[in-house]
Structure formats: structure tokens, C-alpha cells
Amino acid sequence: MDTFSIVFYKTLSGEKPAKVFLNELSHKQRAKTIRDLKILELCGNRLREPHSKYLEDGIYELRTKQGSNISRILYFFFVDRRIVLTNGFIKKSMKTPKNAIELAVRYKNDYIERYI
């Protein structure tokens, strides 16, 4: 079984928003999120709830829970079995914040424009 490769979206200024988010997590939350990223890398587009959920416009969320802390990293699939991590947030409400999804869609469109 071929694995997928995970890459971080990089803005024109060189920032990697999902990586910044990951580094800001507590040690335990980061470790659990990295474990979930490895599962995503192995399963790719076959990964489903409770680990991953399709949101809209080609954007998915990786769902990680550590105690009462719930984090999400948004991502999309790209050619050559690539998973592009766009941004992340700590979940504080039942619904995924619309602005987080809109940001992920903007990053996705920018990535596609620059790499196709």
C-alpha cells in the first residue's frame, strides 16, 4: 500500500500556518496530533470519522482530542498522493468556524495556482 506524503502549505512570505499552529500546541496535544498525522499519511483519503471529516470545497479536517482539548488541522489532497496542511485551530464550538474554512480554501486555491 502506497502512503501519502504530508506537506505544509507555505505562504508567499514563507510562513507555514499549520506548522505554526502545531508548534503552539501543548506537548501532549502536539504528540497526539503528530500520531494522527501519521495515520492520515498511511490511510490518506480512506481515513474517515472520528479521525477525519470532509467539510466543503475539497477541505477536510483532521480531528484530534487530548483530554478536554480538541484541535483541528485543515487540509486538502493534491496530485501525487500529497496531503497539504493549511491551517489549524482549537475547537471551542460545535461547528467548525467558517473563517477557518474560508482561509483553508484561500490557501488551497493559492497552492493550486502556484504549483500547477
Where are these regions (language model features)?
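Basic, Lys/Arg-enriched alpha-helical interface segments
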Residues: M1-I70, V79-I83, K92-I116
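Conserved catalytic cores of phosphodiester-cleaving nucleases, focusing on short active-site segments
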Residues: T86
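Compact, Lys/Arg-rich rRNA/RNP-binding cores from ribosome-related proteins
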Residues: F89
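Conserved Hanks-type protein kinase catalytic core
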Residues: F76
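Portal/gating segments that form or line small-molecule/metal binding sites
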Residues: I73
